[in-house]
Design a protein with these regions (language model features):
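Transmembrane helix interruption/hinge and helix-loop junction motifs
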Residues: 81-87, 235-243
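Active-site recognition of the HExxH zinc-binding catalytic motif
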Residues: 108-117, 154-155
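Membrane-embedded alpha-helical segments that form the functional core of polytopic membrane enzymes
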Residues: 69-107, 134-142, 251-252, 317-329
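Long, contiguous internal "core" modules enriched in hydrophobic/ aromatic residues
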Residues: 207-220, 228, 235, 241
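Core segments of transmembrane alpha-helices
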Residues: 61-73, 219-234
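Cytosolic/stromal cytosol-facing helical appendages immediately following the last transmembrane segment
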Residues: 1-53, 123-214, 242, 253-424
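Auxiliary, metal-adjacent structural segments of Zn-dependent hydrolase domains
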Residues: 15-102
Length: 424
């Protein structure tokens, strides 16, 4: 049941409203759910296990990713050999690369959810899918190592956003820290992933986890797969297109695609300086990152026409490109993944909506609309010492007496608890 106390909270840089509600009368609501990343689902929440996919559903989802990879190389070869003007070749080539990046990172996030047990009920099939179907084609971290680094450390309430969290270490390696100058923040925000050292580190990491540090059976299977693939590509005469439209996107472009969303994924380097209950602090480090701006339904005549053009251009030139290139699949609702890691990515937007304003040990949900708001929140936190963008600290202080019966039991530390169980 919804509780006014747990209604969604917004930052000072946002619109102060649920922007998605302004889209509710537009046609084709599933499309707007995809564009914005936010659902208007008003049904009761489902149990996480009720959101899992059937094997055929997961493999249908994966198969269209393989189709994109295959067609990108085939059509890319034809494009390179065509007599089209250079500008058109560049435009079409960029679109192909964008789609390959989308599916490469789609594979990564499908692997991510499958590792969490949030794709298939059959765990043996899930492990097989992670190893042979999802990770080898993109040279992703082997499953067992990923469980250690991501599930046991990044998701643990004890190590999340600490020096033991590999995702925080990644931000530190890219030059971010609490107390940095604003000029350094903006410079690194834009340029960090293009630094040659960072690119080489990324390539070395992908090679090491696949062919050096991985278990022997992983190294052998990956070496055989890639030897066969490269041999087939070379023999068929598609090597140039394969390098440009497959290898370049998955090894280079994906870095910037990932970077755009990763920098605002959490409130990096934040510490529990105000003594919040542990799960409330954990929940305060993530927020819904949706794409859009209010639909101008309140305007009329010429004012509406001008506002509608501006709104439409924002959808076409900002929201859809960001959704395709960087915020694919579940990423707008990544905050809810940390609250309910067992919910499948196909259902995460509707389930997040179903859980909004419901009492939770993680506190009220929070959200932003647009990348610029995310960047300003991160700047304020890292450069200006303003580390409570949604007012969660004041919210807790004002409502502590009422919250205590609901949250204290869940927020008490548990002794002798394995890290793998200390997750959200």
């Amino acid at each position: 049941m919804q509780d006014e106390l747990f209604k969604t909270r917004y930052s000072k840089y946002g619109y102060g409203i649920d922007v998605r509600r302004t889209y509710k009368d537009l046609p084709c609501q599933p499309f707007w759910t995809w564009v914005t990343g936010k659902s208007l689902n008003d049904r009761p929440p489902r149990r996480p296990k009720d959101t899992l996919l059937k094997p055929w559903q997961l493999y249908l989802h994966i198969s269209w990713g393989y189709a994109v990879f295959f067609l990108a190389v085939i059509y890319g070869q034809q494009l390179l050999a065509s007599q089209q003007p250079l500008w058109l070749k560049c435009l079409l080539g960029a679109l192909i690369m964008c789609l390959v990046v989308n599916r490469q990172r789609g594979f990564l996030h499908t692997f991510h959810y499958t590792t969490h047990g949030a794709s298939l009920e059959n765990k043996a099939l899930a492990r097989f899918t992670c190893k042979w179907i999802l990770s080898i084609p993109i040279l992703h971290t082997p499953r067992d190592e990923y469980v250690k680094l991501h599930v046991n450390e990044h998701h643990s309430v004890r190590t999340f956003n600490t020096e033991h969290d590999v995702d925080l270490v990644f931000m530190k390696q890219h030059g971010f820290y609490k107390g940095m100058s604003e000029s350094a923040f903006w410079t690194r925000l834009v340029l960090a992933p293009f630094h040659p050292a960072r690119i080489l580190e990324h390539l070395k990491f992908r090679f090491d986890v696949s062919f050096v540090s991985a278990p022997r059976h992983e190294r052998v299977s990956r070496a055989l797969y890639w030897a066969a693939l490269l041999g087939l590509v070379y023999a068929s005469g598609y090597l140039e297109a394969f390098a440009l439209f497959y290898l370049f996107p998955i090894f280079i472009l994906t870095q910037y695609s990932s970077w755009i969303q990763h920098v605002s994924e959490h409130l990096w380097f934040a510490r529990n300086e105000h003594g919040l209950p542990r799960f409330l602090h954990y929940g305060s480090l993530s927020w819904g990152r949706f794409l859009g701006r209010p639909y101008p339904a309140d305007k009329q005549g010429l004012a509406f026409a001008l506002a509608f053009v501006r709104w439409s251009l924002g959808v076409l030139l900002i929201d859809i490109p960001l959704r395709v290139f960087s915020f694919m699949q579940d990423l707008p609702s990544h905050d809810f993944h940390h609250r309910k890691p067992g919910v499948n990515f196909w259902r995460i937007a509707p389930e997040r909506a179903a859980n909004e304003a419901r009492p939770s040990k993680f506190g009220p949900m929070t959200e932003t609309w647009g990348m610029w708001e995310n960047f300003l929140i991160l700047r304020d936190h890292l450069c200006r010492g303003q580390s409570d963008p949604f007012g969660i600290v004041d919210w807790y202080r004002e409502n502590h007496a009422r919250l205590a019966p609901e949250t204290d039991a869940a927020n008490q530390p548990r002794t002798n608890q394995p890290a793998s169980q200390a997750t959200a």
